[in-house]
Amino acid sequence: MSDPLAQDPLLIKPTEDEPEIILDKERGIFQFTGSSMPEDPGTFFTPICDWVGSYAQSPNSSTVVEFKMDYFNSSSARYFVEILEKFEEILDRGSDVKVIWFHFDDDMVMIERGEDIEAVVSLPIEFRKLGPG
């Protein structure tokens, strides 16, 4: 008998225009890595938003979401906010949620973009250096 709370991982391989996405409830991995400027943001991000929405209904007791972005456009930023708002619902219901925004030492653009997103959502974002860029 399968576990009704089980959720298949969502794994998206990176392309030149799309980030690598790993959403794996069982292993506790929630990562967004690379560059994000998909040609059709709605088509790209809808399954991600749906997956996180389902996860929010039965989350792990602790969730760590990692962003290791090199670049993302404004459409992607809007979807990142939407995704983080779903993780925010988990926090509001009493589970632990942590967001880590990785950046290179000198990448002020990615630091500022992370701060812009942090200002919009009610999730604290921890900024963590990856080293020199």
What function would you assign to each model-found segment?
Residues 3-46:
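STAS-typified acidic loop motif
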Residues 12, 38, 92, 116, ...:
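Extended interaction regions within the primary functional domain
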